[in-house]
A protein has these predicted regions:
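A short acidic, Gly/Pro-enriched loop at the edge of an enzyme's catalytic core
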Residues: 73-83
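A short His-aromatic
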Residues: 90-92
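Class I S-adenosyl-L-methionine
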Residues: 137-166
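Conserved alpha-helix/loop element of class I SAM-dependent methyltransferases that forms part
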Residues: 1-16
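Residues lining the SAM
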Residues: 86-87, 115
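A short glycine-rich, Lys/Arg-flanked "PGG" loop and its adjoining helix->strand segment in the class I
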Residues: 97-108
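Class I SAM-dependent methyltransferase SAM/SAH-binding core
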Residues: 21-72
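Conserved beta-strand signature within the Rossmann-like core of class I S-adenosyl-L-methionine
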Residues: 109-117
Length: 166
C-alpha cells in the first residue's frame, strides 16, 4: 500500500471523487491508505467471504462484491477511474487471465496499478498476457523491484506496474 500511495502522489492524477476498484481487496488494507488520502468512492472485490467481512467492518467501501477475478465479473465494464490490484496477482491466488478483466473494468483514460512478483511474472504468464493486451493500455511507470512482504517467508521481489487504459 505504501507503493500505491507513492504512485498516486508522484506519477498519476486521480481526482478525489473518482471511482476506484480495490481488486482482491482482502481485509481492506489498501482502502485504508486510500481513505487516508481522502478517496472515498471505493468498491472492493474479493473471492473470500471471510476477508470481505473484515473489510466491511471498516466502513470504507461503497460496495463489496464476492467474486473471482479469474473470469468476467458481474461488474459493469469501463466504469473505474482507477483499478488497484496488489498482493493478488501471484501463484495460488489470481492468475494472468485476470488481466483481461481488470482492463475491461477500467475506463478509457483510467489507470491500473498492479503489483506482480518478479519470480512469477514470466513463469506464470503475466508478462505474456500484458504483451498480448499491449494495445489496450500505455505503461506509465514500472517500479524498481521491492520486497513486498519483508517479514514473510515468501519475501519475493515485486514490481508495481502502472498502466493507463487507452
Amino acid at each position: 500500500p505504501s507503493k500505491v500511495k507513492q504512485i498516486l502522489e508522484k506519477y498519476i492524477t486521480v481526482k478525489k471523487g473518482s471511482k476506484i476498484l480495490d481488486a482482491g481487496c482482502g481485509t481492506g488494507y489498501v482502502a485504508e491508505v486510500l481513505k487516508a488520502l481522502r478517496y472515498n468512492n471505493i468498491v472492493g472485490i474479493d473471492y473470500s467471504k471471510d476477508m470481505l467481512r473484515v473489510a466491511r467492518s471498516k466502513k470504507i467501501y461503497k460496495k463489496l462484491v464476492c467474486e473471482s477475478l479469474s473470469k468476467k465479473t458481474s461488474l459493469k465494464g469501463n466504469q473505474f477511474d482507477l483499478v488497484i490490484c496488489t498482493g493478488v496477482l501471484t501463484s495460488g491466488h489470481v492468475g494472468p487471465s485476470s488481466i483481461k478483466e481488470l482492463i475491461r473494468l477500467t475506463k478509457p483514460g483510467g489507470y491500473l496499478i498492479l503489483s506482480i512478483s518478479e519470480k512469477i511474472f514470466s513463469k506464470l504468464g503475466f508478462k505474456r498476457e500484458l504483451e498480448k493486451r499491449s494495445n489496450e493500455y500505455n505503461y506509465i511507470k514500472l517500479s524498481k523491484p521491492f520486497i513486498a512482504l519483508p517479514n514473510h517467508k515468501d519475501s519475493a521481489r515485486s514490481r508495481m506496474h502502472t498502466l493507463q487504459r487507452v
